Amino acid sequence: METLQRTANRGSISTDTSFQVDNSLKTDEHAGEYFYRNSPTAGNKRTFTFSFRIKRTQLTGYVADPYLMSQGSNQRFHFAGDSLRFMFDGNSTELEASGRLRDTSAWYHVVLAVDTTQSTAANRVKAYLNGQDYPWNNTKYPSQNSESGWMSGSSMYFNTRDGDGAYHNSAYWAEVVVIDGQQLSATDFGEFDSDTGIWKPKNVSGLNFGNEGFYLNFQDSSDLGADVSGNNNDCTLNNIAAADQSTDTCTNNFCTINVINLSTQTLTEGATKIVSTDNTSRTSFGTMAVSKGKWWWEGKIQVYESADSYPCIGVTGDLDNPPATSAQLWKGNHVVVLAKAQKWVTNDTGYSYGTAYADNDIINIALDMDNHIMYTYKNGTIDDASGINFSSQSAATADDFYIPINLVYVTGGGSSWEMNFGGFANYTISSGATDDNGYGTFEYAPPSGYYALCTKNLEEYG
């Protein structure tokens, strides 16, 4: 299970005080969300650069070859088996890279730089991933001085195939840049941190974008397609609204639900909404694990589809052998609350709490890993001030990592959770509460000393 722990280096999770990216754009394949530059004037069709940062929330296999960019029927930049594939002008100039982008807990920085005037074929199309050369598997380079449909007068699409309403990505996007007339390198957009070695973004506002270039930073929720390069080459949004703005970014990466471990559940809304509809117990996990510190997140019960549906929320310390059935919840290193049964479950014991949860209730988790106690709240009100102590669990005594967990225990029907770890929530938040560091956006404020599960806080407290 791919999980971000405090010791991991996942590209562009900078915690320093240099250039910070405040916002990203959430796109969802199931909602047909994409954006595009509508009918631009033709730019330089031989020399150009694309740069963007992306955090995937769905992998190839769920959607066949999801598209990153397209412009016309023969110009495509998309995933193929979770590797990058670029089509300069038809199949005769199609290049595919070797490495796979399968870590859904990570932000990736992708740069594609083209200059067909180069005499050396390998220099005509260059790709970079997190600041390093990203080699191509084949050598179908364009001929010298050839022109393509890229940077032409046709519309340039992001997150779909040429606007045909298909092959969308589910992902977070940040720092989308198009450069007209220059072949730039990765170091024009980012740099390696001198202390940590992490690839981090630079402020790109001073770049020469060229006449048809643009820069999307997604900071204005009322105009998410706004070009802030100075060119006013704004993009048009399709099925994207202000609510799709996120604070999960390449400089502060938030926990989400891990797509890697799903079976039949449906994961949408930036990997925050999980739906289980079959007659089987299903488990899902977060992308970040902790062994110390105090942490806060929320989960909204969206629907009970059956009288025998029991949504559960909590943590597990069995990262390699998590519970897959309701019976397994009572064994091992798990601490969960059964939303409908009014039970905390740990160490083969059930403990009663206040009133049962109902549809649309928000359950808050306050996880104290320093003392190994989990507290639960119903719509901001604590269930039991004593919490549930799990310090005797073998994972706790070994100071092992615990990870957020959701389980839908059903004997008929199903249910769903809308999770909010602070970076994005599918439900409307009226209060906009943050932790003491100003991170996260929650319906209910974290208690003092409890923090959102994000890389800024993990670096300091995790």
PLM region spans:
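Extracellular glycan-interaction surfaces
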Residues: T3-E29, S51-T60, Q75-S146, V345-Y353, ...
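Extracellular glycan-interaction patches encoded by glycine-rich segments
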Residues: T93, S148-W173, V408-T411
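Extended recognition patches within non-cytosolic domains
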Residues: M1-N23, H30-A31, S119-A121, P135-Y141, ...
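Glycine-aromatic-enriched beta-strand/loop faces of beta-sandwich-type recognition domains
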Residues: D89, C312-I362
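Short surface loop/edge beta-strand patches of beta-sandwich-type extracellular domains
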Residues: E29-F48, E94-R102, D162-G165, K200-G206, ...
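Short hydrophobic/aromatic patches on beta-strands that form ligand-binding or substrate-lining surfaces
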Residues: F50-Q58, V110-L112, F158, S170-V178, ...
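Extracellular glycan-recognition modules
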Residues: A31-R85, Q118-A121, Q182-T187, V290-K292, ...
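Low-complexity, glycine/proline/serine-rich flexible segments
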Residues: M1-R46, S83-R85, G90-S92, S152-S154, ...
